[in-house]
Amino acid sequence: MKHIAAVIVVTAVLLFTQTYTSARGAEYKIPQTVDMTPVAEEPAELYALSAVLMDGESGRVLYEKDGERPLANASTTKVLTCIVALENSSGDDYVQVSQNAASQPEVKLGLQKGEQYYLEDLLYSLMLKSHNDTAVAIAEHCGGSVEGFARMLNRKAKQIGCEDTYFITPNGLDA
């Protein structure tokens, strides 16, 4: 189970932070002159609703477009759902599927009410295929309800330093 947690955390970091750093011990010589000629023209319009470009070393924001704009957490919610589930349960727990979980919209595994699965299997489904029904089944198992699990997500988000972040569902869909 710890191996799964490590793989998920590493995957999440690589996929969602987009921070790149140099290899340890590598020595670089800074050139005396740097060609500052743009490689390409700046796009006339950035198509993303919001964007932030940050220096990975200093944390300084280099570019921002509506960086404070509230947006849906989307599938990044599922990463935190997985982390909270791993911290509050065991992979060999049996999870019974409710009607609420079974009735989630696409993308879904196709869980049916009354079926039982190992939590570990549902976590794989959640992280590899982003299944909405497995997120709800996991949430109901670990938090007693979607609402209870949302409180757990919000506590964890605050604990790890997330600001202006609020979870309502374990799958990132609108409530």
Please tell me what each predicted stretch does:
Residues 23-175:
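Active-site-adjacent loops and short helices of periplasmic peptidoglycan-processing enzymes
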Residues 2-22:
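Sec-dependent N-terminal signal peptides of Gram-positive bacterial secreted proteins and lipoproteins
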